């Protein structure tokens, strides 16, 4: 026989209304009581009846998690999976239903999408700088939050402070004596790339340094190289770095600052295949898109963050907007510079 909300209330020694409020995110319940009820519900195996609650409130309590290029992604990363875990972690403890969609806005508008799927809110990832979806999302009566993005509406975004993180990584290299830095920026057009470049330029400008065209490796989204043995951003970084090395060799730059761990993986392969060493010939840094950089040889210096925190915080912000319709300030998830073996100290060189 299925466990009911009354069973949870009886076991926890509280009223049915208190259990309902604790499991649906109301703030009139103390933290201690909420934790006790949640632990009791988990122990008994209670599953909230989302459909029943939706009928009573005439709301679906359903969140759409939209990852537009989910079916087209070539890279094998755990960022998306960890963000989904974070979203589900919040929603499962607050009585919300979440469904993942690989929605193509060219096939159906967001207004049509919300109507056909009866969603009360939208979480969307990977918005690019000139994203036409943003204006459409602003016009529909359904709250949304951009995840792992910094869209043009600050109160509707959850992500890392990319400019600050890139500036910190640049300062880390400068502090270690690197003044000839090659920036492997990756695919053009993303908000992340633009903000990270702002951070790099800011930190270098503070040292009266600048970047020239020859100091940047980037490429158009979807650009592919031929005969490269790896895929996605790694493939493109590998190809671009091979071209760079054939033209400049070593000595022109002492460090490569990558806007993605996956870009760093491609850069590393090109450097190794050309017979150069990391960090003796090129120091190398990434930007926290993976959890495997620390297992590289040498271990990759990178910007670390947890996508699970991003997913959880995004779902929480969206839930607040669904319930209270309030605008809040943009929240940034924490990060840190993980200094490892891929950067050589050249201060005395």
Segments (PLM) and residue ranges:
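Hydrophobic alpha-helical segments within soluble ligand-binding/sensing domains
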Residues: 158-184, 193-205, 233-246, 264, ...
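Short, solvent-exposed amphipathic alpha-helices that sit
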Residues: 36, 78-93, 191-211, 236, ...
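Periplasmic-binding protein-like
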Residues: 120-125, 182-184, 229, 233, ...
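Short beta-strand elements in bilobed, periplasmic/extracellular small-molecule ligand-binding domains
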Residues: 91-102, 201-234
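Flexible loop/turn connectors
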Residues: 238-349
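N-terminal helix-turn-helix DNA-binding module of bacterial transcription factors
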Residues: 1-61, 344-349
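Alpha-helical recognition/docking segments in bacterial nutrient-uptake
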Residues: 62-171, 175, 246, 250
């Amino acid at each position: 026989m299925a466990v009911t909300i009354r069973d949870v209330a009886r076991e926890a020694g509280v009223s049915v209304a208190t259990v309902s409020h604790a499991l649906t995110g109301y703030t009139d319940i103390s933290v201690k009581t909420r934790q006790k009820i949640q632990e009791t519900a988990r122990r008994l195996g209670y599953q909230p009846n989302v459909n029943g609650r939706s009928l009573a409130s005439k709301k679906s309590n359903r969140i759409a998690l939209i990852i537009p290029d989910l079916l087209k992604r070539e890279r094998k990363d755990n960022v998306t999976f960890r963000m989904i875990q974070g979203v589900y972690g919040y929603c499962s403890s607050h009585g919300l239903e979440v469904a993942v969609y690989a929605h193509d806005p060219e096939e159906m508008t967001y207004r049509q999408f919300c109507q056909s799927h009866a969603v009360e809110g939208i979480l969307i990832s990977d918005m690019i700088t000139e994203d036409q979806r943003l204006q459409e999302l602003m016009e529909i009566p359904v709250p949304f939050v951009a995840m792992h993005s910094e869209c043009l509406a600050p109160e509707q975004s959850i992500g890392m402070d990319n400019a600050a993180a890139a500036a910190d990584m640049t300062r880390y290299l400068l502090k270690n004596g690197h003044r000839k830095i090659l920036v492997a920026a990756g695919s053009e057009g993303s908000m992340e790339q633009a903000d990270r470049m702002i951070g790099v330029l800011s930190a270098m400008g503070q040292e009266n340094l600048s970047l020239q065209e020859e100091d940047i490796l980037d490429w158009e989204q979807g650009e592919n190289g031929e005969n490269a043995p790896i895929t996605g951003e790694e493939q493109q970084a590998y190809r671009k770095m091979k071209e760079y090395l054939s033209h400049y060799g070593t000595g022109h730059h002492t460090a490569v600052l990558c806007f993605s761990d996956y870009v760093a993986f491609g850069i590393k392969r090109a450097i190794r295949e050309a017979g150069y060493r990391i960090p003796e010939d090129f120091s190398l840094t990434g930007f926290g898109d993976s959890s495997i950089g620390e297992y590289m040889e040498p271990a990759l210096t990178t910007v670390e963050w947890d996508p699970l925190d991003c997913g959880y915080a995004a779902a929480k912000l969206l839930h607040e907007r669904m319930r209270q319709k309030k605008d809040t300030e943009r929240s940034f998830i924490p990060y840190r510079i993980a200094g490892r073996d891929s950067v050589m100290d050249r201060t005395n060189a």
